[in-house]
Regions:
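N-terminal active-site segment of His-dependent metallophosphoesterases
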Residues: 1-71
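Extended active-site neighborhood of metal-dependent phosphoesterases/phosphodiesterases
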Residues: 3-10, 68-129
C-alpha cells in the first residue's frame, strides 16, 4: 500500500490563531430530526470564529462512519458559519472515518473527494507581520 502525501502552503499576514476540534460524529444518512450533532458542530465553529481562528484543525471522526452525506454536512457547517471567509482547515481522518466502506482505501478515496484534500496532507503556514 502506497500513501501519497500532499503539501499545502498558506501565507497569512496576521496573528495565527489555531482552533482544534474533533468528533462531530455526523450522521451518515439524512434522518428526521437528526440535527443534534450538526448543531453542536455549528456551535463549536461559531465559538472558534468569535475567537478569531484563522486555522482550524479537525482531529478526526467527522462522521459516525465514512459517508458522503456526513462530509457534505461538515462542509456546509463551515460555510454556514464562515460564509466565503472560511479559514484554513486541516481535516484528519479518525477511526470512525474508516468505518462503513469495505476497504480503508475506499474510505480515504471518499474522504479526499468530499473534503477536497488527502488525509495525508502536510500543511505549512507562514505568518508575516508588517
Amino acid at each position: 500500500m502506497e500513501f501519497k502525501f500532499e503539501r499545502k502552503t498558506f501565507n497569512i499576514n496576521e496573528r495565527l490563531r489555531v482552533g482544534i476540534i474533533s468528533d462531530s460524529q455526523l450522521s451518515p444518512v439524512r434522518r428526521k430530526n437528526e440535527t443534534t450533532f450538526r448543531n453542536n458542530l455549528v456551535l463549536s465553529l461559531s465559538v472558534l470564529k468569535k475567537q478569531g481562528c484563522n486555522m482550524i484543525i479537525f482531529a478526526g471522526d467527522i462522521g459516525n462512519m465514512a459517508s458522503g452525506f456526513a462530509y457534505d454536512t461538515y462542509k456546509a457547517a463551515f460555510k454556514s458559519v464562515f460564509g466565503e471567509k472560511i479559514p484554513i482547515i486541516q481535516s484528519i481522518m479518525g477511526n470512525h472515518d474508516y468505518y462503513g466502506l469495505r476497504t480503508s482505501e475506499n474510505c480515504r478515496r471518499l474522504f479526499t473527494k468530499k473534503i477536497g484534500s488527502s488525509p495525508f496532507t502536510h500543511y505549512t503556514v507562514t505568518v508575516s507581520y508588517t
